[in-house]
Structures are given as C-alpha cells and as structure tokens.
Amino acid sequence: MLKYFISLLVLISFSAQAKEELFIYNWSDYIAEDTIENFENEFGIDVTYDVFDSNEVLEAKLLAGGSGYDIVVPSGSFLENQIKAGVFQKLDKSKLSNIGNLDPDVLAKIEAHDPGGQYSINYMYGTTGIGYNTDKVDENDITSWSILFDPAIASKYEDCGIAMLDAPTEVMEIALKYVGKDPYTEDEKDYEVALAMLQEIRPYIRYFDSSQYIDDLANGEICLTMGWSGDVFLAADEAADGVEAWYSIPSEGTVIWFDMMAIPADAKNVENAHKFINYILRPQVAADITNYVWYSNPNKAANELVDPEIFEDPAIYPDEATLSMLFADTADSPKKAQLSTKYFNKFKSN
C-alpha cells in the first residue's frame, strides 16, 4: 500500500511538472474570440488570459516585479522606458520563424521604441480619435476636436452622453496640440493652458473610462467619445438595432500608437511565450484578430486575408494623406509623465 501511495505521489508530481502553462496580460477586447482556444488546442498549453485598460495599470505591475505574466502588451511609448528599467528580457528570434512576415514600413515606425526589435514584437496598432453615434451627432462636427474641446459644441451632446478616455498621456497630448502647444512639451505653463480649456468642457463629460465606452456606444448609452480606433469600430460592428456608430480622425491630427508583445524578465514560461508570439505572427492568425477587433496588424503577409472593408479604410490602415495628420506616441520623460498625470487628474476631478 505504501509503495502504491509513493508511486501515486510521484505520478502526481510528474503531471504537475509536465503541465504546460502560459500567462498573458493584454488590453481588453483586443483578440479574436477563438485565438486563445485554437492556440491551446494546437500546442497543449493552458493559457490564463487577463486584461487591463490602461498603460499605467500595466506599468505599475511591471515595475513592482513578480507580475506572474509571461507575455504583456504595453504601448510602444511605455515600452521604451520599461526596457531601460530592465523590465523585459531579449527575445530569442531563432524561435520566431514567422518574424519575416512583419512589414518593413511598420518596423521602421517602431524603431525608436525598441531599436532592432530586441525586446518586442508589434501586436497591433491604431489611432486615437472620435467615436460617435451617426444619428445623434452632426456630421459637420466630427471633423474637428472642437466637438469635444469647444464647450459651445460639446454642450449640444451632453444629454446623449460624452465619454473620455482614462489615459493621461494621450488626452493631454491631444489637448496640448488642440490649444496650439507642443504635445511633447515639458513646460508647465503649456499644461495650464490645456487644463483651462479642458475645465470648460468638464461639465459635459459623463465619465472617464478606457473600455466601457465600447458597449455604451454600441448600445446607444453615449453618443460621443474620445476612443481608440479599433474599439470604436468594434462598437460599430456590434451596435444594437437602431444604433449606428463610426470613427473619425480629426483634421487637427492625432496620435498613432503601436502596442508591443514583450516577455517580462521574470517570466516563468519563456519557451511557451515564444510559441505564442510566433503563433500570432502567422498571417491567418493575425488577419483573424484584425477582422474581429478592427485594429491594424503589422503582418504584411496577412494583408490579403484582412476583410477589404477594414484594409481599405484609411482610418484603420492609414494612407499617406492620413499619415500626414498623425504624430507619434513617444516615451514620456519622468517630468512629462508627472505633468500629464497631474493635469489630467485635475481635469477629471474638477
């Protein structure tokens, strides 16, 4: 009996050791419905998939250490400083056989975030713009940030509901550009000018959130939001009967950003992390995600597999004219990060 019991313990111990796992921390509403399940079935790896809705939340976990995740997806502007802080380990590109599918033009745009792509692979990219209900919002208003930042215009939409991203860096950069200041400024007086403008429109904002607006726009609970391109298009795709939503890039310009897959330095399942990244780099997998979340992927080999309605829309896959209206999301200096958070919080609490 004792011999049987010992054998059973050994078997249980071996089974526990043999269990293949992977822990992923990604943005909410940012993957196709079957991506994880398909990966698990093919590789026999159990995936724990958690979500966040702000770079600040992710960064706090990473800098504290011991996050428990094997793959995380920070925006490139945050990734830059996280690399400097030693948060990530270098990728083993010998394990990424599909890396050649990446578009050289996209790689050039993200070079500043991670020179040579030593630590990260671009997952998806997009822009920050205006999400709106086509029946409740005047189409003449959606071409400019004035729809959110001019109180005379924003007040028209107070009753049908305005939401704002809970994203200090992006909101403050866009607000600074709107008032004619450098979006990358470290001059506190410039932030005071932007705050004065934001305080004028604060009474008309129903809430600040970086994911709730998707369902609310789709269900008609709000009619206007600052939002991320794919999230707004997802709301449009899932809109309830009688609700139509769409996305606009304002004429004053906006941020283009790139979200990056990276492996934390203390990740426990590094081999499986590389398997997942390489899986995402398959053309069909990348296209399936884009077709579901409506965000651009960097996989050139996937272009022909992306729904033409998505691939041919310059608000999703920017053409040269659209690119000329965009400015890069860059890494914050400690001072800029502090100013962005300080003045954004003043805006929220006003």
Which positions does each model-derived feature cover?
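Early extracytoplasmic/lumenal segment of secretory-pathway proteins
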Residues: 19-82
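Conserved C-terminal helix/tail region of periplasmic/extracytoplasmic solute-binding proteins
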Residues: 215, 320-350
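Paired acidic/hydrophobic, glycine-rich loop segments that form the ligand-binding mouth/hinge
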Residues: 70-74, 206-207, 223-228
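Extracytoplasmic ligand-binding site segments that recognize negatively charged/polar headgroups
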Residues: 73, 79, 83-204, 211-218
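A bilobed periplasmic-binding-protein/Venus flytrap-type ligand-binding module shared by bacterial periplasmic
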Residues: 129-136, 177-180, 257-269, 288
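A ligand-binding cleft/hinge motif common to bilobed small-molecule-binding domains
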Residues: 78-81, 224-243
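Periplasmic-binding protein-like
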Residues: 191-200, 206, 241-265
